[in-house]
Structure formats: structure tokens, C-alpha cells
Swiss-Prot record:
SUPFAM superfamilies: S-adenosyl-L-methionine-dependent methyltransferases. This is DNA methyltransferase CcrM. Pfam families: N6_N4_Mtase, RAMA. GO terms for molecular function: DNA binding; N-methyltransferase activity; site-specific DNA-methyltransferase (adenine-specific) activity. GO terms for biological process: DNA replication; methylation. Belongs to the N(4)/N(6)-methyltransferase family. Keywords: DNA replication, DNA-binding, Methyltransferase, S-adenosyl-L-methionine, Transferase. Residues 273-370 form the RAMA domain. The gene is smeIM. It comes from Rhizobium meliloti (strain 1021) (Ensifer meliloti). It catalyses: a 2'-deoxyadenosine in DNA + S-adenosyl-L-methionine = an N(6)-methyl-2'-deoxyadenosine in DNA + S-adenosyl-L-homocysteine + H(+). It is an enzyme of class 2 (transferase). Overexpression leads to many branched and bloated cells, two to three times the size of wild-type cells, and cells that have 1-3 times the normal amount of DNA. Contributes to the accurate cell-cycle control of DNA replication and cellular morphology. Can fully replace its ortholog in C.crescentus.
């Protein structure tokens, strides 16, 4: 079960990781400033939208629209909102690991201001994502287009950031083996997923659908990563993170939201380890040199390798190079040379004989990779 901790407890904590899988009660900037540097893999932020509602909204039948009119969404001016945005973004960057990324979601009311400030602070935008809603709220007055989407910005802490997580192969496989696009179609949160109080009213006015958070976490985190949400609300980020085997840290100042989020997260059952395996491409696999096969004894010096049709042959030398007809070089260079080509993938071109069957040396590389995976 997730715990709820105060800012005072975080500040005087002797153990630096006691805030994992917890909801910190307090102001987001103060809470962020109490966390260790470079301790978070991903930030998902759903900040106040600063809707600037001029009054109550009514449907054509004069029933009241359940819009966001809470105090936490009220700012005296755009300047005040911008100052608040700069403060929490800077605090998030401090806690992000150098390989970490930040997601922020907003509507047309705030996302352009947030995006401009992000770039002013030298965050580096990787993508903007359109969340297209299958069931958006109508424009009741008929004076504008129906607002049917929200925008997400995905960014690294700076332009030179390297090594961030993007599970490209998993996203492609989930999209019927076609590259995942930057426009995502999800319904707004409704039905049994929508948290409601004893009075039947929504617990939180802007609760995000779990499917949206699941895609974000599956795309940009690994099992065991730490996901921070500085505007935790009803705890969607924490619930999805727990289910997907990620750690979470939530920051929230409203006790009613904290209570609802803690109860919600406590009811979540994490998925099994085997279920959480993420598909990876060859680029994500550990690099194995051909010489490693020789050093490990999988291929012995003096072994004769051929192509699949036995047209070309080469002898394996003790230093991990190949020799053929007075030429010598790497598996790739010699493979290209004997064919008269500019380039060659030696792993799939050269074959070894097992019994009477020719097999690509890439199979032996897989043996080494599997051994490395067991060590990790």
C-alpha cells in the first residue's frame, strides 16, 4: 500500500529512498526541493490549466456543466502562472536523472505557455503528442469548434541528453508493426474508472484515463523505474505505475485527493514479472564482438566458415579475424571483400557447420547475449 508522508518527514529522512511509492502532502515546488538530485527517471505533470473561466457554464437545457473552478486552478495573472510554471519545471529538472524525461499535458489554455517556458529553460522537446478524445465535451454555445484534444509535450532536460528510454520496438509492435504515431485516440475517463465520492460527484474534475498513462509509461520507462507526478490528484499515475511494476512518487496538497488516491492505489494488483517484459530491437541488445566467440571457445581458431551456399570460405584466426585467399579482416570486411561488395553483415553471411547443417554465426552470438542477460 502507498504511504502518505509530510514534507517535514522527507526533509529529515535518514534514508534517501523512503519517499518511494509514497504520496507527499504539500506544495509541489517545496516537495520537489526536498527530494534528492537526479533521483527520478520520468516526470509526468498535469499542472493546473489556468482555465480563466468567466462564470458558470450551462448546457442548452440550462443544467450546470461540471467544469474546473477549484482554487488550485486560479491565478491572478498570466505572469503569476508563468512564474509558477518556471518554478516547478526547474525543480523537476533537478530531480530528473541525466537520462530522464519529462511529460507535461495541457489544453489550449496553458500548453503553449508551458511549452515556451520549457524551451526558455533549455529543455529539449522530443515530441508533441495529440491526445484525441473519442468522447469530448461538446461546445454548448456553438461559437467555437468542439475542443476534442489535449496536447502532451515529451522532453529531455537539455539538448545534449542521451540514453533516455524509448521502447520503440514495443510501441511499434503494439501498433500492428507500424511506427507509433504522435496522435493517440483514447476516451476521456468515465464509467467505473471515474472516481466518485459518497455523494456521487466526481472526486477530481480532470482525472486522466489509465490507458493514456499506461502508454506513456510503457513507451518511456522500464520496470523498476521511478515515476514522479508533482500534481498527483486522484492518483492515476501511481495506480498505473504500480500495476506496471514501476515505482511512483506523488505530490499533492489536497487531503481529499490524497485519501482517494491512496485507497485507489492500495487496491491495485501489480502484473507479474513475465508480463512486464518489454520488446526490444537489436540495437538494444548488448554488443558482442566476433572475437568474444573465439575467446569463449564457441568457435575455435582454424575453423572453416562458409557462406550459406558454400561459394566462399574463410579460416578463423586466433585474433578473431578471418583469412581467405591472401586477404584478411573482420567478419564484415572480409565478407564484403570476397563478394566484391562495399559492405556485408558478417553475422548473417558467414556460417559454421554443425553435423551436416550450416548455421549462421549469429546463432552463437545469441548464446553469448543470453549468458549476459542471465548475469544482469
Amino acid at each position: 500500500m502507498s504511504s502518505v508522508v509530510s514534507l517535514a518527514e522527507i526533509s529529515r529522512a535518514a534514508r534517501p529512498l523512503n519517499w518511494l511509492d509514497s504520496i507527499i502532502k504539500g506544495d509541489c515546488v517545496a516537495a520537489l526541493n526536498a527530494l534528492p538530485d537526479h533521483s527520478v527517471d520520468v516526470v509526468f505533470a498535469d499542472p493546473p490549466y489556468n482555465l480563466q473561466l468567466g462564470g458558470t457554464l450551462h448546457r442548452p437545457d440550462q443544467s450546470l456543466v461540471d467544469a474546473v473552478d477549484d482554487d488550485w486552478d486560479q491565478f491572478a495573472s498570466f505572469e503569476a502562472y508563468d512564474a509558477f510554471t518556471r518554478a516547478w519545471l526547474l525543480a523537476c529538472r533537478r530531480v530528473l536523472k541525466p537520462t530522464g524525461t519529462l511529460w507535461v499535458i495541457g489544453s489550449y489554455h496553458n500548453i503553449f505557455r508551458v511549452g515556451a517556458i520549457l524551451q526558455d529553460l533549455h529543455f529539449w522537446v522530443l515530441n508533441d503528442i495529440i491526445w484525441r478524445k473519442t468522447n469530448p465535451m461538446p461546445n454548448f454555445k456553438g461559437r467555437r469548434f468542439q475542443n476534442a484534444h489535449e496536447t502532451l509535450i515529451w522532453a529531455t532536460p537539455n539538448a545534449k541528453a542521451k540514453g533516455y528510454t524509448f521502447n520503440y520496438e514495443a510501441m511499434k509492435a503494439a501498433n500492428d508493426d507500424v511506427q507509433m504515431r504522435s496522435d493517440w485516440l483514447f476516451p476521456i475517463c468515465s464509467g467505473s474508472e471515474r472516481l466518485k465520492g459518497d455523494d456521487g460527484k466526481k472526486v477530481h474534475p480532470t482525472q486522466k484515463p489509465e490507458a493514456l498513462l499506461a502508454r506513456i509509461l510503457m513507451a518511456s520507462t522500464k520496470p523498476g523505474d521511478v515515476v514522479l507526478d508533482p500534481f498527483f490528484g486522484s492518483g492515476t499515475t501511481g495506480a498505473v505505475a504500480k500495476r506496471l511494476g514501476r515505482h511512483f512518487v506523488g505530490i499533492e496538497r489536497e487531503q481529499d485527493y490524497i485519501d482517494a488516491a491512496a485507497e485507489r492505489i492500495a487496491a491495485v494488483e501489480p502484473l507479474g514479472k513475465a508480463t512486464l517484459s518489454v520488446m526490444t530491437g537489436k540495437k538494444a541488445e548488448p554488443r558482442v564482438a566476433f572475437n568474444t566467440l573465439v575467446e569463449s571457445g564457441l568457435i575455435k581458431p582454424g575453423t572453416v566458415l562458409t557462406d550459406a551456399k558454400r561459394r566462399y570460405s574463410a579460416i578463423v584466426r586466433a585474433d578473431g579475424t578471418l583469412a581467405s585467399g591472401g586477404e584478411a579482416g573482420s567478419i564484415h570486411r572480409l565478407g564484403a571483400k570476397v563478394q566484391g561488395l562495399d559492405a556485408c553483415n558478417g553475422w548473417t553471411f558467414w556460417h559454421f557447420e554443425e553435423g551436416s547443417v550450416l548455421k549462421p554465426i549469429d546463432e552463437l552470438r545469441s548464446v553469448i547475449r543470453n549468458d549476459l542477460a542471465k548475469l544482469n
